[in-house]
């Protein structure tokens, strides 16, 4: 299309071919958010983070990433809608040739903004829900108006020709109503539905005892989802259901981000560049886009090279015949659960720390924590956590 600028520079190809291109750029525009979901993946101390990047600084990030081969950009947060320059950022990403995603709670979205984003060239909008039940949704979101606003905006997104992509984070307090969740999605004429069981990073890790479903809950929920899949397929229905399980019930770890610094690059609101959105908590000095080019960050910085390849691996990963499949699992999870990011992901049954995972499974069977007892993601709690750390 004539309104898209071609990538004028040939992508830099590193001397070590095992380093992939940063194809997927996650632009965390802000940590500000009107909601306070207790499973948010943002850092616990988000309230103390530095000043947000300016419009021009984000333009530079996108330009440099595109020149390196980045193809897709996700605008996320916090809530990206609080940025007044969001339409400008979308338009620039479109001009550069990115496929553009907006990942939003829908709070703050209006029909006028949807039209403006469409004109700017936005390709895709994903709206998240907390539950199919208004009371539970609003309790988890920390807003009495959240559910009604989400419904209204989901319908508006559909009216304006976007594929309707809905995301439900499931956990022990809503997973038993997964049939109601799917029915709501069908009523909204969703094209894609991600039923993503809570992943335990950030605030979700803090609240794990009150969020991790039991194994029986997961088995039932997946069975219900499969029944709906079969029915939809028989009816030739276009809606696709994606069921994401927590790796706490697996015996082998996920190949997190397809390998550290291999395909995925996050830039946080203050410009810190990360190989995944959870890596900020590690005791590693990650580079900042204010100080370094994206090329230096991706290929030369210590933070992005720390866990590339296999030479860093201790046992049991070093001699494992599965290391090329899972890269030792998730470095952030290894750090959170064992205190050392170089350890094998405790999800793996070969890990010396696998007992941490089996203990969490056992605890889920007797957990009694209510929604009201969860630590909600808000400025007050974040400041308290930052002060005590």
Swiss-Prot record:
Residues annotated for [4Fe-4S] cluster binding in this entry: 33, 37, 40
Domain Radical SAM core: 19-234
Superkingdom assignment: Bacteria
InterPro entries xrefs: 4Fe4S-binding_SPASM_dom, Aldolase_TIM, Elp3/MiaA/NifB-like_rSAM, MoaA_NifB_PqqE_Fe-S-bd_CS, PQQ_synth_PqqE_bac, PqqE-like, Radical_SAM_PqqE_MftC-like, rSAM
Names of the cofactor(s): [4Fe-4S] cluster
Pathway: Cofactor biosynthesis; pyrroloquinoline quinone biosynthesis
GO biological process annotation, one example: pyrroloquinoline quinone biosynthetic process
Residue stretches in coiled coil: none
Top enzyme category: oxidoreductase
HAMAP family reported for this sequence: PqqE
Classification via PANTHER family: PQQA PEPTIDE CYCLASE (PTHR11228:SF7), RADICAL SAM DOMAIN PROTEIN (PTHR11228)
Complex formation: Interacts with PqqD. The interaction is necessary for activity of PqqE.
Function noted in UniProt: Catalyzes the cross-linking of a glutamate residue and a tyrosine residue in the PqqA protein as part of the biosynthesis of pyrroloquinoline quinone (PQQ).
Name the UniProt record assigns to this protein: PqqA peptide cyclase
Lineage per the UniProt record: Bacteria, Pseudomonadati, Pseudomonadota, Gammaproteobacteria, Pseudomonadales
Gene it is expressed from: pqqE
């Amino acid at each position: 299309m004539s309104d898209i600028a071609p990538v004028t520079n040939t992508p830099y190809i590193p001397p070590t071919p095992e380093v992939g291109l940063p194809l997927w750029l996650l632009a965390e525009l802000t940590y500000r958010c009107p909601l306070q979901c207790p499973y948010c993946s943002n850092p616990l101390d988000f309230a103390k983070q530095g000043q947000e990047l300016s419009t021009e600084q984000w333009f530079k990030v996108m330009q440099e990433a595109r020149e390196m081969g980045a193809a897709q950009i996700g605008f996320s947060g916090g809530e990206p809608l609080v940025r007044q320059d969001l339409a400008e950022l979308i338009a620039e990403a479109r001009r550069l040739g990115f496929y553009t995603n907006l990942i939003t709670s829908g709070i703050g979205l209006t029909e006028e903004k949807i039209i403006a984003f469409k004109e700017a060239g936005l390709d895709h909008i994903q709206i998240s829900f907390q539950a199919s039940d208004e009371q539970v949704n609003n309790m988890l979101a920390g807003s009495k108006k959240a559910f009604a606003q989400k419904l209204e905006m989901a319908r508006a997104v559909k009216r304006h020709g976007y594929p309707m992509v809905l995301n439900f984070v499931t956990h022990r307090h809503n997973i038993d109503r997964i049939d109601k969740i799917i029915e709501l999605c069908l009523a909204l004429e969703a094209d894609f539905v991600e039923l993503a069981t809570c992943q335990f990073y950030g605030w979700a890790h803090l609240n794990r005892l009150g969020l991790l479903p039991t194994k029986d809950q997961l088995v039932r929920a997946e069975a219900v989802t499969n029944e709906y899949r079969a029915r939809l397929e028989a009816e030739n229905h276009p809606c696709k259901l994606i069921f994401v399980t927590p790796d706490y019930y697996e015996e082998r770890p996920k190949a997190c981000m397809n390998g550290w610094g291999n395909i995925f690059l996050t830039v946080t609101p203050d410009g810190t560049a990360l190989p995944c959105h959870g890596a900020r908590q590690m005791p590693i000095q990650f580079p900042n886009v204010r100080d370094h080019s994206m090329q230096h960050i991706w290929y030369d910085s210590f933070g992005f090279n720390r866990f590339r390849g296999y030479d860093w691996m201790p046992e049991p990963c070093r001699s494992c015949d599965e290391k090329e499949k899972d890269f030792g699992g998730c470095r952030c999870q290894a750090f959170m659960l064992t205190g050392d990011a170089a350890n094998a992901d405790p999800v793996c049954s070969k890990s010396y720390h696998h007992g941490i995972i089996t203990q969490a499974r056992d605890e889920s069977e007797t957990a009694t924590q209510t929604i009201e007892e969860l630590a909600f993601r808000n400025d007050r709690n974040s400041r308290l956590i930052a002060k005590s750390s």
